[in-house]
Amino acid sequence: MATSVIKSWADAEDEIPAAEVINNPDGTKTVINYRMNANGQKIRHIQKIREVKVKEKVHPLIAMRKNWSKYGKEKDMPAGPDARTTQLGEVVELKLGTSWKEIEKEEEEQKAEQTQQIVSNQRIKCRTCGGNHFTSKCPFKDTLISDSANTSAAATPEPDTDASGKYVPPSLRKGAGAVRDMSGRDRDDSTTLKISQLNTFVDEDMLRNELLKRFHPLQRVTIVRNRETGESRGFAYVSFVTERQAEEALNTLNGKGYHSLILHLEWPKKRKAN
């Protein structure tokens, strides 16, 4: 609150009263300070303070060292470290004893158990997509085989003629039937999307709970991984409940940024016209 206007700063130093400390019945203290603002007005500042004492139990030798008197350049300085001359480090717990070999042995056994558990979890691995299932039951074997066949065909095109020089139609060339399903019919992927340009640390849970959270429920989320290392190859296949839901995800997320990369969503293979 403003009480008066002072024209001279020299007069202000004389007219500003000292701080007042009032002890309240409830154990708190009321501190009243006065200061000058930019307009030369005297401002009264009231604070209510409650002092809390925290008791810390330490070893008697530690308490004794804290009472040692300082010497040298720190002579007559108050107790406690001075930030100008003392640099505080991290607290390190030192455990002394003769059983350190046993502790190291236990840690090695725990690491061996964790490694064995990881190996057992990765024992069943699909040779097509690297997932945790048998190769014969891979839900995306037809799509991946189709992608591999298209890539191989683009790199090494099949000749139009055989050894005798006769024309061979594409349907009768070598490997023409490799993209068909073993049952003789094509798989229905009308609700499946292929998500490319994913960061390598993105897993199935991140796709479900972060990227595709608004499009739940999801039938299946599979990240294609390297067969040898188990590392993500940068793309995944997601099966939605309805085709409309998949199309909405395609229009919403295609071209959007996700973990420093631009996503590319597409249908896994060319769909038949309605």
From Swiss-Prot:
Spans annotated as Disordered: 149-170
CDD domains the record matches: eIF3G, RRM_eIF3G_like
Keyword Phosphoprotein: yes
Primary localization class, coarse: cytoplasm
A molecular-function term among this protein's GO annotations: RNA binding
Residues covered by the RRM domain: 191-270
Example GO biological process: translational termination
Family designation: Belongs to the eIF-3 subunit G family.
Name of the protein in question: Eukaryotic translation initiation factor 3 subunit G
Protein's organism: Meyerozyma guilliermondii (strain ATCC 6260 / CBS 566 / DSM 6381 / JCM 1539 / NBRC 10279 / NRRL Y-324)
Lineage: Eukaryota, Fungi, Dikarya, Ascomycota, Saccharomycotina
Gene designation: TIF35
